[in-house]
Amino acid sequence: MKSRVNNLSLEKTDCDLCGSGNYKNLYSVPDLRFKNFKHEYSVVQCINCGHRYLSPRPSKDSMHLIYHDNYYKNRNEVDLKQKNRFILQADYLPKIANGKILDIGCAGGGFLKFLKNKGWKCYGVDFIKTKYKEKGINIKYGYLPERSFPKLFFNVITAWGVMEHVHEPSVYFEIINKILDNKGLFIFLIPNGDSLWSRWAFKEDIPRHIHFFRPKIIKEYARQYGFKVHKIYYTNKLYSRPASGKGLFKRRFLRSLDIPWVKIINNSFDLSMLKKIQYYFMKIFDALLIHPKLEELFHLCGNMVVILKKDIK
């Protein structure tokens, strides 16, 4: 992983939503998930529209360098955790006899195989070829804009944890509107950019996440690209490990002391007696004040499932 990241190409970018190049820096973090501290990546917020994104970000040609070999491990239907997630995801779909569905970011097609067994006509697209692929599932590899589908073809299009990874969400919204039928739904899971997990606990999967959507920003994307927001669900239930902000008090306290990320993640920092006492109270605050169910209740949990309808005028 380290040798691959040495070849990473970074690029500055303007706001995908409004095109403005004016932004303010919010915070910077390295790749905390895979503990690579070579680069720190800056999360910025557009001054014009408020959209948050990564800049500089990995270029599209070098994105494959930041996906660990095990990134798609155990994402087939045989894995019990994945099958439970497929059941929960399917609950968001409408009941359509012989419906045609496209799953963007389908990996090896595990969710599509699950749906095929329930009568759906299944199609998939993913920009990474995985080591496994379900048999009998029609999957095109590459980015969605590079793959063609008929206009008004699909009843439902899904994207589970995808839109935050793509360089130009605007292009995806435009294409999805064209290939979705006039009564179709676009159903997608994204991190909640207003959540404790995302905004305050530094837990976004940076640099693989390059856009940080908030409800008001999703509504603006929908308006610009011919959709209406039908429903937004705030949920921590789709994954076995909830996207909770637990730990934010500890992390933010340590960062306020200018302790490097490598020491925070490896728990190798030294504190004075006074700071140790303060750190102890931060741990108490994390335990008492932050809970996944409360985060869901107050729309502060890390994930949202968004359902968009085409806006037919």
Regions found by a protein language model. Give the residues of each.
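Hydrophobic anchor at the start of a short beta-strand
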Residues: 23, 122-123, 229-230
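Conserved SAM-binding loop and adjacent beta-strand
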Residues: 74-88
